[in-house]
């Protein structure tokens, strides 16, 4: 059995392919071809990020690869500068629009780095609630975190 057909099972029961196409350093103009070639080879896990600047091309590749969308595990990442729930949620909606997709299987916080005010805040409880909130599916079920 090829590693391309092997999966890990996440704690929530969702299966993620063990091997995925990482698209860092793939230009947006080349991303669709790269995704289509990877899917033709057997890849079913495609990874991009807002910071890579290639979500449009990756989405095009996903939409035009010839494999049904529900058979692909598509992941993107919220850019590190989005520090609030509102900003992160807006950026996820923008990602879906750029990619031309209705949903992503996983959205990751890319390189979560604290900011200078993190320990200065009087509102850490409320800020912490945003992490709990984004761990639930978005109210439109257009993406899952």
Predicted regions and their residues:
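N-terminal binding-site loop/beta-alpha segment at the start of enzyme catalytic domains
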Residues: 1-72, 89-90, 102
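Residue-level detector of conserved catalytic or cofactor/ligand-binding positions
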Residues: 132-145
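Feature marks short, surface-exposed loop/turn motifs that line or immediately flank catalytic pockets
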Residues: 25-27, 52, 82, 110-116
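Catalytic beta/alpha-barrel core
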Residues: 48-50, 107-108, 142
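A short, structured active-site edge motif that brings together acidic residues
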Residues: 70-82, 103-112
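Hydrophobic pocket-lining residues within nucleotide cofactor-binding pockets
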Residues: 26, 78, 137
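Glycine/small-residue-rich loop that forms an oxyanion/phosphate-binding "nest" at active or ligand-binding sites
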Residues: 85-99, 105-108, 113-128
């Amino acid at each position: 059995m090829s590693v391309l057909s092997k999966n890990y099972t996440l704690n929530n029961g969702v299966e993620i392919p063990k091997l995925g196409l990482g698209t860092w350093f793939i230009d947006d103009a080349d991303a669709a071809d790269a995704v289509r070639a990877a899917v033709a080879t057997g890849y079913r896990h495609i990874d991009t990020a807002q910071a890579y600047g290639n979500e449009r091309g990756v989405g095009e590749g996903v939409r035009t690869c010839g494999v049904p969308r529900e058979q692909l595990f598509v992941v993107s990442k919220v850019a590190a500068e989005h520090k609030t729930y509102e900003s992160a949620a807006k950026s996820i909606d923008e990602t879906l629009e750029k990619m031309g997709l209705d949903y992503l299987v996983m959205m990751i916080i890319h390189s979560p780095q604290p900011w200078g005010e993190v320990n200065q805040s009087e509102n850490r409880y409320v800020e912490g609630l945003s992490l709990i909130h984004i761990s639930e599916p978005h109210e439109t079920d257009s993406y899952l975190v």
